[in-house]
Amino acid sequence: MYDTSLTLTEFDPELADAILHEEDRQETHVELIASENYASPLVMAIQNSVFTNKYAEGYLGKRYYSGCEYVDVAERLAIERAKVLFDCDYANVQPHAGAQANAAVFLALTNPGDTVMGMNLAQGGHLTHGNPSNFSGRHYKIVPYGLDSETGLIDYDEMERIALETRPKMLIGGFSAYSRHKDWARMRTIADKVGAIFWVDMAHVAGLVAAGEYPNPLPQAHVVTSTTHKTLRGPRGGIILAKGQSEDFYKKLNAAVFPGIQGGPLMHVIAAKAVAFKEALRPEFTVYQRQVVANARAMARIIQQRGYKIVSDGTDNHLLLIDLSAKPYTGKDADAALSDAYITTNKNSVPNDPRSPFVTSGLRIGTPAVTTRGFGVTECEQLAGWLCDVLDGLGAGNEELTVIRDRVREQVVALCHRYPVYQ
């Protein structure tokens, strides 16, 4: 029997202290990492439910354990709601994360050694789209596509030329740092010309897609993967979607998830996905996603007015990429200086970046989290100005940077107190 008289603070004060400090950080710092957001209290609460105790290997109606009748309800709701949310006829809600969903697609639809075409990580792609450090780059012949060096936009003509030359088995859409709409129809046409499977990883824009604020890759894509956090604002997890494909195709995807790469699904997380999908089906979610884009565009406008370069010259979604390659400091320097001012961003490579991924010449910023806490265009314009103040100070030298950093930190804390996350 568990001793329920002890609080976490009494039982494990070190861990309790870390949680309290993280809560304070989230409340008093501005979160501009494009892949982060704040889950709702309901999403967090259900992950603390008794569903965490239940093993449920297998799928609905075909479990390897008994006693699954109630967790089946949660998984069924998650599947049904995902289908409505993304207008599809297949949904697998079991992947533990987006990377696991992506691994399942590779396992289901390709063989090791196949040629796969994905967006270059240094130009906005993702590790799991073929980076040499990832399983996808180790076990497949990866052919990258990228951006036009002048416009910062995807060069679809060059993509088609490369595809016709290399004949990939699979073409990957999706990104981790691209601020414009992708032309899914054009990419499907390219895939069809070479007989390739067209897979879209929409992890960054799933919430925008659900709200109709970003083009839905279905039905152009044969298969779509996503995380369930980021713009979707659910728990940390993954999902696989498809529409109009054969039952055999769906069976391959299911088998790749279980038993292919996973054992028991995380039923408490699947239940939280169901809650998040229900939240995303409400009208308020569409209003939120529109504001996410409006806020990103407002920040881009101010940053450009202050003389900073943005890759692709703007944004159509929730993120923007600032090119600092002409500055006397690095992306890593900028990240650290902003963090000291309580503005959390992340260093990021830019096209043709001469620096390593650990240093970089860019900053990626996004507006999902600040929009969740209630920031509008006015607040985001202020925030963009403060961000530029810090970058200006970084270029001016340590003494001026210290003065600017302290002022901006006070302004950030005051703004955050006006728009609390949970308190």
Curated annotation (Swiss-Prot):
Residues noted as binding (6S)-5,6,7,8-tetrahydrofolate in the record, renumbered to the chain: L121, G125, H126, L127, S356, P357, F358
Domain of life: Bacteria
EC number: 2.1.2.1
CDD domains: SHMT
Plays an important role in substrate specificity (site feature) positions: H229
Keyword Transferase tagged: yes
InterPro entries named in the record: PyrdxlP-dep_Trfase, PyrdxlP-dep_Trfase_major, PyrdxlP-dep_Trfase_small, Ser_HO-MeTrfase, Ser_HO-MeTrfase-like, Ser_HO-MeTrfase_PLP_BS, SHMT-like_dom
One MF annotation (Gene Ontology) recorded for this entry: glycine hydroxymethyltransferase activity
N6-(pyridoxal phosphate)lysine carried by residues: K230
Transferase keyword on record: yes
Record key words, sorted: Amino-acid biosynthesis, Cytoplasm, One-carbon metabolism, Pyridoxal phosphate, Transferase
Compartment(s) of residence: Cytoplasm
Main localisation: cytoplasm
GO biological process: glycine biosynthetic process from serine; tetrahydrofolate interconversion
Cofactor dependence: pyridoxal 5'-phosphate
Reaction equations catalysed: (6R)-5,10-methylene-5,6,7,8-tetrahydrofolate + glycine + H2O = (6S)-5,6,7,8-tetrahydrofolate + L-serine
One Gene Ontology cellular component annotation held by this UniProt entry: cytosol
Pathway terms, separated by semicolons: One-carbon metabolism; tetrahydrofolate interconversion; Amino-acid biosynthesis; glycine biosynthesis; glycine from L-serine: step 1/1
NCBIfam families, A to Z: PRK00011.1
PANTHER family: SERINE HYDROXYMETHYLTRANSFERASE
Subunit structure: Homodimer.
Family note: Belongs to the SHMT family.
Function: Catalyzes the reversible interconversion of serine and glycine with tetrahydrofolate (THF) serving as the one-carbon carrier. This reaction serves as the major source of one-carbon groups required for the biosynthesis of purines, thymidylate, methionine, and other important biomolecules. Also exhibits THF-independent aldolase activity toward beta-hydroxyamino acids, producing glycine and aldehydes, via a retro-aldol mechanism.
Official protein name in the record: Serine hydroxymethyltransferase 2
Source organism of this protein record: Pectobacterium atrosepticum (strain SCRI 1043 / ATCC BAA-672) (Erwinia carotovora subsp. atroseptica)
Taxon lineage: Bacteria, Pseudomonadati, Pseudomonadota, Gammaproteobacteria, Enterobacterales
Recorded name of the encoding gene: glyA2
